[in-house]
Structures are given as structure tokens and as C-alpha cells.
């Protein structure tokens, strides 16, 4: 990987910084989340939200979406050039929920985007604070990952719905920068590339002319991002082939789908960050916590600490289970939608169940839902232990495959085996090893066949007590090796529709 020497930690990507030492990183990440908190407090003042209403996760999401929309340059420009009926390109808004006479009411608010931008900049020392915006995008993306299934999107691009564990970050907007690229799964990158290649096949001019040159640069950049996520030489070599193709077409699509399948066992490195709703940072700032001075990290104990001391509420529909709603938000907060349920349950200290068993729908409430019957309850976002977030796929050692699983992309750096049904995965690799990538394909299949489900990943890594902030005493959990835990089994979640 060419950028080896300039590898930045994800906190640096998150804050757009050059290389910094640990203290500087903690300070700049602290500045970023502190800015989000200050913005949130100001918005609550503007909207005259009570303390309880300000802690409502649905209100937090509306406020976050407003600021993201206010800074969405490309869409703003598009809206101004293509005026559509009933949409004011200069305004943004959404539903705000208020408590009136013992009932929840929905109020639709509208604000000038200019005004929202002013409040955001003011909260961020006059800067645009793009890092904070990206942070909010990643929180929304993590929430989508935990809430919706992407079966339809997978099938549309010719991939297998069982590859859902590779789809982290699939709803992130294009403008989410380096921090966004770091959290995208293998499947997400493959899907973006396939969509691009398909456009090129259907539209003769896609790769031509001035625009085509820009398209080509974007294509190669995406290929390089994907290449950087693979950890074996053969997978990377195949990515070079895809990137260098003169005229990307069906052969490249085949190669990409092959690579995506291979990532079920030879997992890629995908970053995980605990991005919390804006109201959580707001609560901390309001209570006098100075994020910049104290420093903050998205991958250590800090988010766990913050959630231990925050009370957040959620609207609950009549037949939803509040404990299940809490699990959904907990998973989103820790970017754990693709983590092994055995690991998540151990860290959380309560059983985390597969999505098919959850009696809850998404967090956001549609405008046509009846507010009369809405109730609210406290989200239980606390944990029993904390663990370091990982950006590796948990392969037992870099060049050799370790057992993957049809649906796990580890979030926490905690020792476990990664059980998987090799037969199921290998069945997808019938025959086709001819063509220009044949030797690489053969090599990849060989590595996958030598993977053993009983291999231990993250050897010796454990969880920590919440009092152990320096991570001195790892507690290595022992898991039932046979029982494998994917969140997506027996899945009946709704599809993500933009």
C-alpha cells in the first residue's frame, strides 16, 4: 500500500488533521464533539425545547439532519437549479416532538439553511467544522446499519444477500471524506464500483471527455480505497487489475463480486467508531464537561463513559419493546451491527438478540404515523464492560486467512473464534478461475480453504472494567465455540429506502 508511511489514525481522518501525537488527536476529536454539543444546546434554545424534549433521540436526529442538509453544497446547488414544487431550496426542517398535556405532539419546523450554518459555525469557533458533520453522518450510517437490511441493494448489483455483513456504511453520502471511507465495508465499496461500471456500460460517454476524466479519477480512487482494505497480496493484486482496466466492464464486475465473496473469510480492515447522537454531546457540554481540555477518543473508553452517564429517551410505538429499541440504539452507538452477538452481549452485560427477534421498528417516525398512541421511554445505553474498537478484520495473521463468518465484521478487539460454515461460502466459488486473474483467484481460494473455524482471532485481547480507563487488566471472555452469533439470521427488517 503506497500510503503506508502516511497512515493516519481514524481520529486524524475524522478531524482532517495531519499527523499528530496522541494528546493532540484526543484534543482535536474533543474539539469536534464539543462543537457538536454546543450546537445542539443552541438549537434546543432556539426551538425552546424542554430538558426532556432535548433528550429525545428523534429530536436529536431531526436537528442533525437539518445541519447536514444545510451544508450539503451539491444538493443545495441542485435544488436551486431544479426548483421543485413545494420545496424551498433555502430552507430545511423536520419533525420536532413536544410533550403537551401528557401527550406527544409532532410539530414541523422550517429554518433558513443560512441561519443553521451560522449557529453551527458559531458553536465551532467560526469554522465550517466538516469533521463534526462527517461524525454525524457516520452516526446516521451506523443507525441505518443496525436498523435496515440491504438485501434488495445487494441483489440489484448481482451480489448475494448473505454478504450483508460486508455492507457497513452503505448509506453514507458521497461527501463523507476520508473518515467516511475508513468505515465503509468491502461490500459497500464493491457496490459503489459496480454501479459505476454499470453506468459506463450503459452510457457510452461516461468515461469520455472532460467529465470522463474526472470520473476515471474517482473510479481509481475508489479502487485504491478498496485495495487498502484487503489484507492479502492476492486480493490486492486483483484490485490492481480492476483499477488498471482500460474499459471497465463485466469482467471487472465478476472480479469485484469474487473479491466481495472472498472477504467473507479473508476479511478486510474496516474501521469502527462509536459516534453518538448530538444530544449526548449536548448533555455533557451542558453539564460543564470540557471535551477539548479532557480529550476524547472514538475508539476507546470515552463513548462508553459518556453513555454510562447520559439519559436519552425515545418515542415508542404501541407494540414495540423498549428493551429492543435500546438494543438497536446501543448497537448503532458502538457501530456493532456486524459484530458477533456473543461479543456484544458480553460487553453490554445483557443478551443481544438477532434482528429477526426484535419487536421494534426503526428509530425515526414517519410523518403519517399516529402520535395519539405514542409513548416514550428511557433508552438503556449503558454497558457492563468496555473494549477497544478495531479496524482489522480479525484475520489471525496478515497473510493467512482466518475463519470468517457469513456475517461478522468484528467491531471490538476481543478474543474469539469466528465460526463459519465453510461449505456455504465455498459453494459460491464454483469453477470460474480462468481469465486474466486466474492465478490470483486460485491463490485466494487456496487461502480460504485452509482457513480453520476454530482459529482464535484477537489472541489475548479482552474487555475492561469501566473503572479501568488505562486498559491495564484485560478480561478475556470464553465463548461457546459452536454457537455462532450473527445479528442478521432470521432477518425480517425493513429495507432501507432513501
Swiss-Prot record:
Belongs to the influenza viruses nucleoprotein family. GO terms for biological process: symbiont entry into host cell; viral penetration into host nucleus. The lineage of its organism: Viruses, Riboviria, Orthornavirae, Negarnaviricota, Polyploviricotina. A motif (Bipartite nuclear localization signal) lies at residues 198-216. Its main location: virion. This is Nucleoprotein. Encapsidates the negative strand viral RNA, protecting it from nucleases. The encapsidated genomic RNA is termed the ribonucleoprotein (RNP) and serves as template for transcription and replication. The RNP needs to be localized in the host nucleus to start an infectious cycle, but is too large to diffuse through the nuclear pore complex. NP comprises at least 2 nuclear localization signals that are responsible for the active RNP import into the nucleus through cellular importin alpha/beta pathway. It is found in: Virion; Host nucleus. Late in virus-infected cells, may be cleaved from a 56-kDa protein to a 53-kDa protein by a cellular caspase. This cleavage might be a marker for the onset of apoptosis in infected cells or have a specific function in virus host interaction. The gene is NP. GO terms for molecular function: RNA binding; structural molecule activity. InterPro entries: Flu_NP. Homomultimerizes to form the nucleocapsid. May bind host exportin-1/XPO1. Binds to viral genomic RNA. Protein-RNA contacts are mediated by a combination of electrostatic interactions between positively charged residues and the phosphate backbone and planar interactions between aromatic side chains and bases. The keyword Ribonucleoprotein applies. A motif (Unconventional nuclear localization signal) lies at residues 1-18. The keyword RNA-binding applies. Pfam families: Flu_NP. Keywords: Capsid protein, Helical capsid protein, Host nucleus, Host-virus interaction, Ribonucleoprotein, RNA-binding, Viral nucleoprotein, Viral penetration into host nucleus, Virion, Virus entry into host cell. Residues 1-21 are annotated as: Disordered. One of its GO terms (cellular component) is host cell. It comes from the Viruses.
